[in-house]
Amino acid sequence: MVQNIDYAPTFLELAGVKVPEDIQGESLLPLLKGKKPAGWRKSLYYHFYEYPAEHMVKRHYGVRTDPYKLIHFYNDIDAWELYDLEKDPAEMHNVINDPAYSEVLADMQAELKKLQIQYNDTDFVK
């Protein structure tokens, strides 16, 4: 899994410039060379702050893995959504209250908290 935060360290490495230790992303060069580094991320964290805006998507943050996505909408609402992306790639069926996903939900909540701390986005960490 790659993110836009990976571009800066990739370009810096390509230019032969030392990548600052506090940069959040990882260089994509190993992946571009066909090698997956040990410990490469298995999940992505994102935080969407802009609302209202043209797209009218409410403020939210979330975590995504290959099979699942957990989202928390906040500010003027407090709503959680969990999607099984293998069964529902269009994210049309929220399974947050489905008992069959209780273990997945707990794992995703733990991963979300871990990533919020890692990226120092801790205003919403409980």
Residue ranges and their predicted role:
Residues 2:
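Residue-level signal for the nucleotide or nucleotide-sugar donor/cofactor binding architecture
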Residues 5-8, 13-81, 85, 103, ...:
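C-terminal cap/loop subdomain of S1 sulfatases and analogous C-terminal strand-loop tails that border
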Residues 88:
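Intrinsically disordered, low-complexity polar regions and short flexible loop motifs
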Residues 94-97:
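Phosphate-coordinating loops and pocket residues in cytosolic domains that bind phosphorylated ligands
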